[in-house]
Regions:
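C-terminal SET catalytic tail plus cysteine-rich post-SET Zn-binding segment of SAM-dependent SET-domain
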Residues: 2-12, 17, 112, 117-176
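Catalytic cores of histone-lysine modification enzymes
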Residues: 13-119, 174-175
Length: 176
């Protein structure tokens, strides 16, 4: 995790949580019993690739499921992190290192188009996982991680999603 101290991390967590809570109540007032970066009930259990994130209730297309949270890094700090698979580049000078335990969104696995039922949505410097299809309780929540990640981490071991053709970026679509 580089040089970010525990104290700094918890400060970031508190700030992030407060904002997420406000937004959460605005968007979905019935979620007050959920952890504050959760907008919908989710479960973590064995999924497509290791642990996965599952819908704990029916989720409608367009609804926000969960916020992707973590330690906020600037460009310089992000460049020093070479061990995390959970870096999410929000913009040129803001990267979220989502490898922290309290970022439940990190459990959502990748799926190639059109097998995903969610997408990552950047809003005002924050990252939300949003449903792009109606999702039934018990379904695994899957979204396209993007070309760069797929090329680096998924293509070498082979994608496990149910797509007939996997999108391995530069190499183009490759069949199973
Ligand atoms: Zn795939």
């Amino acid at each position: 995790m580089g040089k970010t101290s525990k104290a700094k991390q918890s400060k970031i967590l508190r700030q992030g949580s407060k904002k997420a809570e406000t937004l959460s109540k605005k968007i979905s007032p019935n979620t007050k019993n959920l952890p504050d970066h959760h907008f919908k009930l989710v479960k973590v259990k064995r999924g497509l690739d290791g642990l996965g994130l599952f819908a704990g209730e029916d989720i409608k297309k367009g609804e926000i499921i969960i916020e992707y949270i973590g330690t906020i890094l600037n460009k310089e700090e992000a460049e020093k992190v070479t061990t995390s698979m959970y870096l999410f580049e929000v913009n040129r000078n803001k990267t979220i290192d989502g490898s922290v335990r309290w970022n439940i969104a990190r459990y959502a696995n990748h799926a190639c188009d059109p097998e995903g039922n969610a997408e990552s949505d950047i809003k005002k410097g924050r990252v939300f996982i949003k449903a792009i299809k109606n999702i039934k309780e018990g379904d695994e929540i899957l979204y396209d991680y993007g070309e760069e990640f797929v090329k680096e981490y998924i293509a070498p071991k082979g994608c496990r999603c149910r797509a007939v053709k996997h999108d391995y970026g530069a190499k183009g679509h490759v069949s199973k």
